[in-house]
Amino acid sequence: MSRKLKKTNLFNKDVSSLLYAYGDVPQPLQATVQCLDELVSGYLVDVCTNAFHTAQNSQRNKLRLEDFKFALRKDPIKLGRAEELIATNKLITEAKKQFNETDNQNSLKRYREEDEEGDEMEEDEDEQQVTDDDEEAAGRNSAKQSTDSKATKIRKQGPKNLKKTKK
């Protein structure tokens, strides 16, 4: 390890879970967890520092996956695990892309179908509205005719029977 780190306690829960998974007691000692946490944190800092130096030697300021692979090149087990995780990550992202593309295509198809159904429904509603308008107009005409007929009856009866018709 290159330098002593502050007591970070970044991986306390993970380390205690791993200790239990490998046969330790359910609640390991805090000193044990802290010691392993410092070891893991120091190792990660060293790997990242080596990868950064590799990037600087290549005259780059940003780290790439190849820099981490180069830093792990002397440990074939860790390098193999890193490559396996990278390949798995690529598979997952490709599967998500395919899922999103098919989902987008399906939603586009659904949208088009709904739009076509909506157009058909609008046409039906327009036809319904036209028939309703015709019926309303016919109703108005019949109501108008009935009021006209009442008015003509009143006129025919004259002023004598005006009081009777109002009741």
From Swiss-Prot:
Q: Residue ranges of the Histone-fold domain?
A: 10-74
User: What are the subcellular locations of this protein?
Assistant: Nucleus
Stretches with biased composition (Acidic residues): 114-136
Signal peptide (UniProt feature, chain positions): none
Record keywords, A-Z: Coiled coil, Nucleus, Phosphoprotein, Transcription, Transcription regulation
Molecular-function GO terms, alphabetical: protein heterodimerization activity
Q: Name one Pfam family in it.
A: TFIID-18kDa
Asked if the Swiss-Prot or TrEMBL record annotates the protein with the keyword Nucleus, the reply is yes
The Gene Ontology CC terms held by the record are:
nucleus; transcription factor TFIID complex
Q: What family does the entry list?
A: Belongs to the TAF13 family.
State its role.
Functions as a component of the DNA-binding general transcription factor complex TFIID. Binding of TFIID to a promoter (with or without TATA element) is the initial step in pre-initiation complex (PIC) formation. TFIID plays a key role in the regulation of gene expression by RNA polymerase II through different activities such as transcription activator interaction, core promoter recognition and selectivity, TFIIA and TFIIB interaction, chromatin modification (histone acetylation by TAF1), facilitation of DNA opening and initiation of transcription.
Q: What is this protein called?
A: Transcription initiation factor TFIID subunit 13
**Source organism (scientific name):** Saccharomyces cerevisiae (strain ATCC 204508 / S288c) (Baker's yeast)
